[in-house]
């Protein structure tokens, strides 16, 4: 079975408003892809999650509840994505195992977060591991992995290829300090390493990137393997 998992960052799904144009274009692109048995799609929370969390934090709402709110925001975005796809689940799974079971019934299975402490990148990697996918595509708001956050340092350099250990090391370095911005969390990268899942980190808004990866195994972002 040839399957791929795609992680769509919340920043490209839910910006100032829900990015319906992207959802439609992305779904149309997947519908035209041949040679694959199924796609797992994991969706982030984006502006919807950030708005709820930042507003409620002012009222000292505890972190566990904020985590649950963030998770439910990802599931709302996931449900919105399903409306643009055919042969897709209508109920959003709450666990990776449930999502994997749905792959037997649908070509596309869309989900959000699962539990506090797990980012949607980690969920996507666990999903990929569970369904024996060789590839996870991480659609982000930047066009790959950089030595530093390119939005803060114009001298940051993009990395075309890196191994798992170097990616984990960079993730740790990026997670230190105020206002840190991590391209992928350590847990997701560690799962990829143990299962040999190749990661493509790309600008998720560029539809051609998905096509190049799925047909040619190439991208203009960063490949981690």
Curated annotation (Swiss-Prot):
Inhibited by UTP. Pathway: Pyrimidine metabolism; CTP biosynthesis via de novo pathway; UDP from UMP (UMPK route): step 1/1. It catalyses: UMP + ATP = UDP + ADP. Its main location: cytoplasm. ATP binds at residues 10-11, 46, 50, 140, 146, 149. Pfam families: AA_kinase. This is Uridylate kinase. It comes from Picrophilus torridus (strain ATCC 700027 / DSM 9790 / JCM 10055 / NBRC 100828 / KAW 2/3).
